[in-house]
Amino acid sequence: MSQGKIVQIIGAVVDVEFPRDMIPRVYDALKLDENGLTLEVQQLLGDGVVRTIAMGSSDGLKRGMTVSNTGAPITVPVGKGTLGRIVDVLGTPVDEAGPIDTDKSRAIHQAAPKFDELSSTTELLETGIKVIDLLCPFAKGGKVGLFGGAGVGKTVNMMELINNIAKAHSGLSVFAGVGERTREGNDFYHEMKDSNVLDKVAMVYGQMNEPPGNRLRVALTGLTMAEYFRDEKDENGKGRDVLFFVDNIYRYTLAGTEVSALLGRMPSAVGYQPTLAEEMGCLQERITSTQTGSITSIQAVYVPADDLTDPSPATTFAHLDATVVLSRDIASLGIYPAVDPLDSTSRQLDPMVLGQEHYDVARGVQSTLQKYKELRDIIAILGMDELSDEDKLTVMRARKIQRFLSQPFHVAEVFTGSPGKYVALRDTIAGFKAILNGEYDYLPEQAFYMVGSIEEAVEKAKTLN
């Protein structure tokens, strides 16, 4: 095992000199002899010097300190022992519950599955959230992005999806907290503990206060654990269906930008790293379903300044099967979840996958809302009275649909005081179909706000009169 000496320290970037015949490879993990700090090799500068990123605080480091090459990339514990535990980017437990009970470990840098190992599926994943199930349905083994600016509800939507899917889903889940608030990580842990599903979830945290190296690699640590669960075969030779939650994929990009600047690379558009597309591809191509098992991934994506054309969210779009776009305009109307029904998309929105009835209702809802959007300018200038009877009917139904797309969440019960609702897909389709057909034209639009099924709207209308 070769040893080197630190020759330069600039923030999280540490240069180490090794003997010329024992230079480590890119992505090898180096360990500082004094305090065990891990450094990951990023560049070979020549003359035996390698440039590394510290996976922890570089406070107190000085030139001349001895560093040992481990000869392998960062490896993390995997398997059943990680369930119910919180680990950091290096797989070290941070929940004060003792060492992790597993003898298996895996390197965080792995190749994506080969083309002939991949498997495609059209099976739907019911979430119990009306607007998602109807307009941007999720595929089992697919990739979903929750796009939104600051404070429109990405994390709350993510928590509700975890609540509805992870609890009903008998498989295992991995949650990677990438550069998010420590408080949210704490809330998530207690949410899982209170609902007795902690033994089915592995948690990997690299939060906002961590150095950029940790935030850049923590998503790979979580993914490595999820891949192991997917590929581990049971006695019948089958793998598992795993859920992989990432909050937030933008912070992964941001950490890459910080590391890139520290390494002295020339920035590209808007100051992002020149390797943005490649880094995103390396992560996203590994999140996939094979013939052994599947990974269904749900990723929160922060949109800087609500600009969806920003390079970071724009690069993420290309990899996803469904996009759930959260809108500040809809949130300002008090409609939660603030999903934009006209901007959100899904590859599953196809009559061959969903069936003709679901497809027709979804398209009917979208066309009614689109017509209302076009009429709003006329209403603002001339008022409702100038519209034709047909347009008045469209506006009335669209406003009911808009309110019926809202729903009380289980995870928000503490704040709203109204109990959360899980709405089955067949009830969602039946409710919206009835509104489109005019069966509930006689009900006031307030009756449709923050209810679950259409029957609840009818009951609510009785209390309004």
Swiss-Prot record:
It is a peripheral membrane protein. InterPro entries: AAA+_ATPase, ATP-synt_VA_C, ATP_synth_F1_bsu, ATPase_a/bsu_AS, ATPase_alpha/beta_chains, ATPase_F1/V1/A1_a/bsu_N, ATPase_F1/V1/A1_a/bsu_N_sf, ATPase_F1/V1/A1_a/bsu_nucl-bd. It is found in: Cell inner membrane. It catalyses: ATP + H2O + 4 H(+)(in) = ADP + phosphate + 5 H(+)(out). Its main location: membrane. SMART domains: AAA. ATP binds at G148, G149, A150, G151, V152, G153, K154, T155. Its EC number is 7.1.2.2. Keywords: ATP synthesis, ATP-binding, Cell inner membrane, Cell membrane, CF(1), Hydrogen ion transport, Ion transport, Membrane, Nucleotide-binding, Translocase, Transport. It is an enzyme of class 7 (translocase). One of its GO terms (cellular component) is proton-transporting ATP synthase complex. GO terms for molecular function: ATP binding; ATP hydrolysis activity; proton-transporting ATP synthase activity, rotational mechanism. Belongs to the ATPase alpha/beta chains family. Produces ATP from ADP in the presence of a proton gradient across the membrane. The catalytic sites are hosted primarily by the beta subunits. F-type ATPases have 2 components, CF(1) - the catalytic core - and CF(0) - the membrane proton channel. CF(1) has five subunits: alpha(3), beta(3), gamma(1), delta(1), epsilon(1). CF(0) has three main subunits: a(1), b(2) and c(9-12). The alpha and beta chains form an alternating ring which encloses part of the gamma chain. CF(1) is attached to CF(0) by a central stalk formed by the gamma and epsilon chains, while a peripheral stalk is formed by the delta and b chains. This is ATP synthase subunit beta. It comes from Neisseria meningitidis serogroup A / serotype 4A (strain DSM 15465 / Z2491). The lineage of its organism: Bacteria, Pseudomonadati, Pseudomonadota, Betaproteobacteria, Neisseriales.
